[in-house]
Amino acid sequence: MATQRLTRQKWIDAGLDALILKGPPALAAEPLARDLGATKGSFYWHFKDVPALHEAVVKDWQSRALSQIAEALAKEGNSEKRLRRFGAQFVADKQDPAFRAWAHTSPMVADALSDVDQERLTYLVNLLNHLGVRNPAFAQSCLGALIGLPQLQGQTKPTQAFDTMVDLVLALK
């Protein structure tokens, strides 16, 4: 069993890891306790029930995702560099695909994902406006590409494919 007391945040982090590796069914007291070498009693000390864990995991992810957007807004660099950096960070994110899959079966997750995506779209619209692309539908196309590119099993890396899209936008200006 665990030799140190597990915090609520450690349970949430374990839930995030389990979601990425095993999917939503792994977000339950028993498998998480087993993974952490803890008892279910420790789980229930921090969470009323499994849905409370789900809510905490979703809120934690949403908070981190929104913080990443805020950090991106604060970072230096021209719009091109910022767009490329956003794309690279997005395709490297292992949590986003797991939450997208979970959103198909959970309205709570779907709502949180929608909120995060709306902020991402706002950020992309602003970046693209600075690059001379005024059609907000293109921001949606960019986000759609970033969501889908990691799913393709091609020879081109997702970041490289997104950078090619950015190159095309810059060439067409």
Regions found by a protein language model. Name each.
Residues 8-10, 14, 18-52, 56:
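Helix-turn-helix
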Residues 12, 84, 121-125, 129, ...:
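An amphipathic alpha-helix signature
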Residues 57, 61, 65, 79, ...:
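Hydrophobic/aromatic residues within well-ordered alpha-helical segments
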Residues 66, 92-101, 107-140:
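Amphipathic alpha-helical packing segments from all-alpha helical-bundle domains
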Residues 86-90, 99-103, 142-149:
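Short alpha-helical scaffolding segments that buttress acidic/His motifs in well-ordered protein cores
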